[in-house]
Amino acid sequence: DYFGDDDRKYFDALARQYKTRIKIYLINGDRLRSLPCTKNWTHAIYFRFVIADYFFNKAPKVLYLDADIICQGTIEPLINYTFSEHTVAMVVTEGQKDWWAKRAHSLGVAGIANGYFNSGFLLINTNQWTNERVSARAIAMLSDPEIVKKITHPDQDVLNMLLADKLVYADIKYNTQFSLNYQLKESFKNPVTNDTVFIHYIGPTKPWHDWAWDYPISQAFMAAKNASPWKDTALLKPVNSNQLRYSAKHMLKKKQYIKGFGNYLLYFIKKLKH
């Protein structure tokens, strides 16, 4: 819902660099601001509703991706995919069957036991989405205090409740989730492979943060950044207490002790002020 002069300059340069056309759609999000939000998720999580409705009768399908997803493979199979008549969207599940069963019980929708999906990747059948009135029904549910009490991931939970049994499930390579804070563990399993098409950098630490850009898993983002007009743009520094805390942890993990302890000191100062 914002597009400044600097944004225009960079996107103009990107379009010229790759000899393509980029369309920017500005959304008026005022009506969405009253819906449930958290410190991590603003009203922008509901823009996917507007996107799906806007492209009805303009495009038969729309690929929605969260902004913390990077592409490292071909999307041709998605471009060529044809939906069956009653399927609303293609999604990728997260978690295992026991997690799906828990979410089905918590949200009161039995069909979720067949698969609970992450809403960061949605290939949307715009005709069926509109026929099912998904956006209007989702907003109505998010305005119901009884439903809001049950949900933990506002847009995602409601979409799972509405779309159970109306989905087709894609391979995990189209939404491979990875938290850069896994790097703080002694050991972890990296789910990203050479076959991964979309890496989804979940969690508060992102590859554009200056404390996390140098991990191997961040290099897909860095390669894209370096091949774009943003190549000389500085990475983001920690600005709030949460970011300072994670920055400190990552710096200490990488044995950059001065930066690590310095950010811990700034973190404690910020916490004392609030």
Walk through the language-model features, giving the residues of each.
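A short acidic, often aromatic-flanked loop/helix-cap motif at beta-alpha or helix-coil junctions
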Residues: 29-35, 96-97, 175-179
